[in-house]
Amino acid sequence: MSQNIGKISQVIGAVIDVEFEPGKLPEIYHALRVTNPAIDDRENNLVLEVAQHLGENSVRTIAMDSTDGLKRGQAVIDTGKQICAPVGRKTLGRIMNVIGEPVDEMGPIGNEKEYGIHREAPAFEDQSTKVEAFTTGIKVVDLLAPYARGGKIGLFGGAGVGKTVLIMELINNIAKQHGGYSVFAGVGERTREGNDLWMEMKESGVLDKAALVYGQMNEPPGARARVALTALSVAEYFRDEENQDVLLFIDNIFRFTQAGSEVSALLGRIPSAVGYQPTLATEMGELQERITSTKKGSITSVQAIYVPADDLTDPAPATAFAHLDATTVLSRQIAELGIYPAVDPLDSTSRILDPQVIGEEHYAVARSVQYVLQKYKDLQDIIAILGMDELSEEDKLVVARARKIQRFLSQPFHVAEAFTGSPGKYVELKDTIKGFQEIVAGKHDNLPEQAFYMVGSIEEAIEKAAKLAAV
């Protein structure tokens, strides 16, 4: 079969127009290849994805790498298929880019199978409707905003409140406690963080349980807008062909939207609210609907969501909200108190915080913890104006317990051991429930509040209190 060859007619940043002979237009989403000597000396090293048909014989494409060095009139080859990513066990322990090429300098991936990056969501009859909780070993999450198996979880937070550290801890806990596979999509985040994650996963021995797909901040918007889809195809293989429960981490889903908005204007679309692309909800829906549980396995996804200027009503985080089963909101005020993970216990929500799913005892403890913390929050204005002495005895007790709960919600992480010097803790759900139940019931009213800071189970808090008393 003779190759379908076109030529470049115009280059505008990451968007390239290509002319073909009449009647030979490549389909939407087809991958085209062209040689860009500015990238490296390989032939056909730049992939373009067809985004629009312009008239009789011209297509508008999005480049997956740098377009510096391209010239008008250059030959472009239609591959006849969409961008494909290698899938299967050989992707574990490897880092690849948006077009499935390894970027870790460890040779070819050598996979047996490839999946296209644009795939249909599972049909309704194939989806599973079973609802069950997914234990993470992180107290604040398991108690107050539990994750659903096969659900979508949003990690909300501004810059520097600990989203990436929380994701790394989850990868660590899932690999070590559940032995499950993880797929990590680095979408438009810092290359240094991507490198740190790879190094730390290598050191902690979880790398061979994870596949990493990176399209970082320095990549053109085309790569950042598609890299999450590449990672999703890798995860879908483990779910559909190997019947696995897979964890898909996306850091950061906001950058997926941001990249889409960068290309949208160049594609000639009229911007919508706050300058975002008019197709924002559609693009997000196409990605999110593929993340689900089927009768064979599940994909549970944890998505870090950067909130521009801490504004949750911005269209990007607001659109992501609609798809989530649980939200873990990281708060700057809590981080300022030195409480890590800086999860806001009153702002974080979960669809499965329901006695029918998690059981009566867990539900009752979670609600009583939230009640005490909310009461403390309501009293803070009075404390600020009149001081603690003006409170009733009952309110003083509530404040004391709330401060203990606040500190007990902190926890040392395995992945932060090098920085904190404290060994990481994985806390079983039953120990988490027991600990908070005892604090709310007033069993530990006599212990100092600093005994509850950065410990795992309640037994460790009692031990720490004894050490503090001995000093």
From Swiss-Prot:
Transmembrane segments: none annotated. It is found in: Cell inner membrane. Keywords: ATP synthesis, ATP-binding, Cell inner membrane, Cell membrane, CF(1), Hydrogen ion transport, Ion transport, Membrane, Nucleotide-binding, Translocase, Transport. It comes from the Bacteria. The keyword Aminoacyl-tRNA synthetase does not apply. InterPro entries: AAA+_ATPase, ATP-synt_VA_C, ATP_synth_F1_bsu, ATPase_a/bsu_AS, ATPase_alpha/beta_chains, ATPase_F1/V1/A1_a/bsu_N, ATPase_F1/V1/A1_a/bsu_N_sf, ATPase_F1/V1/A1_a/bsu_nucl-bd. It catalyses: ATP + H2O + 4 H(+)(in) = ADP + phosphate + 5 H(+)(out). Its EC number is 7.1.2.2. One of its GO terms (molecular function) is ATP hydrolysis activity. It is a peripheral membrane protein. ATP binds at residues 157-164. The keyword Heme does not apply. GO terms for cellular component: plasma membrane; proton-transporting ATP synthase complex. It holds the Pfam family ATP-synt_VA_C. F-type ATPases have 2 components, CF(1) - the catalytic core - and CF(0) - the membrane proton channel. CF(1) has five subunits: alpha(3), beta(3), gamma(1), delta(1), epsilon(1). CF(0) has three main subunits: a(1), b(2) and c(9-12). The alpha and beta chains form an alternating ring which encloses part of the gamma chain. CF(1) is attached to CF(0) by a central stalk formed by the gamma and epsilon chains, while a peripheral stalk is formed by the delta and b chains. PANTHER family: ATP SYNTHASE, ATP SYNTHASE SUBUNIT BETA, MITOCHONDRIAL. NCBIfam families: atpD. Produces ATP from ADP in the presence of a proton gradient across the membrane. The catalytic sites are hosted primarily by the beta subunits. Belongs to the ATPase alpha/beta chains family. This is ATP synthase subunit beta. The gene is atpD.
